[in-house]
Amino acid sequence: MGTNIHIDMVIHGKHTAEIRKMFNRVAQAYDRTNLVLSFLQDAHWRRAACKMLGVTAGEEVLDVGAGTGASTRTVARTGAAVTGIDISPRMLQIARNRCKRFQNITWRLTNGDLPFPDKSFDAILMVFCLRNVSNIQGFLCDAARVLKPGGRLVVCEFSHPRRFVAPFYRLYLRYVLPRLAKLISSDPAAYEYLTESIEDWYEVDELAFMLEQCGFQNTSWKRLSFGAVALHRALRGPE
């Protein structure tokens, strides 16, 4: 599939450098803020994503957008060799400090790319990070490149609830979440960006189609929390 490509993050007027600064600013209170804003569901979503990935001991796993290492730790407990990457040095420093007891985690600071050889990993996990990439399909195709044939990809992202939940969800995103963020976050503006990026995100079938366009197969998805979050699972096709 060729060499790795650099995917610059440009979403809602923000470039990679701006997004890096934003995550550096929110890093210290990131986990606590997410727990409150998700009504204690954040940890549940992450566990569900890791369970769907189905990792076993000895596998090579890439955690994209590892952040403070919340999902990375869960994967590492399986005995897999985990590489956690992120664009924020502050996030990764917190992750390193919290995961010192894990000898099977390697941390790497990146610039929004996947700087790895072809067919490097058995599985890839992306939890709440794909929205921050401008060229979503290009990034997913690069993920296919670094996966081994038959390798698994799981994407956990915010989604769009349907039917009676949708209007209440929009009300929360536009009015409640920003006000809560002002009370508990070190950077409320970052959560305005969060709202915008969620509202502009793809429908579940649209993301599934992009995965298939990149050569992924057996694509499926699962909705969580009345559709506020969706998990996508796909396999890289054979050679």
UniProtKB/Swiss-Prot annotation:
Belongs to the class I-like SAM-binding methyltransferase superfamily. MenG/UbiE family. It catalyses: a 2-demethylmenaquinol + S-adenosyl-L-methionine = a menaquinol + S-adenosyl-L-homocysteine + H(+). It comes from Tropheryma whipplei (strain Twist). Its EC number is 2.1.1.163. It comes from the Bacteria. It is an enzyme of class 2 (transferase). The lineage of its organism: Bacteria, Bacillati, Actinomycetota, Actinomycetes, Micrococcales. HAMAP family: MenG_UbiE_methyltr (MF_01813). NCBIfam families: MenG_MenH_UbiE. One of its GO terms (biological process) is methylation. The keyword S-adenosyl-L-methionine applies. The gene is menG. This is Demethylmenaquinone methyltransferase. S-adenosyl-L-methionine binds at residues 68, 86, 111-112. Methyltransferase required for the conversion of demethylmenaquinol (DMKH2) to menaquinol (MKH2). Keywords: Menaquinone biosynthesis, Methyltransferase, S-adenosyl-L-methionine, Transferase. Gene3D superfamilies: Vaccinia Virus protein VP39. PANTHER family: 2-METHOXY-6-POLYPRENYL-1,4-BENZOQUINOL METHYLASE, MITOCHONDRIAL, METHYLTRANSFERASE. PROSITE patterns: SAM_MT_UBIE, UBIE_1, UBIE_2. Pathway: Quinol/quinone metabolism; menaquinone biosynthesis; menaquinol from 1,4-dihydroxy-2-naphthoate: step 2/2. GO terms for molecular function: demethylmenaquinone methyltransferase activity.
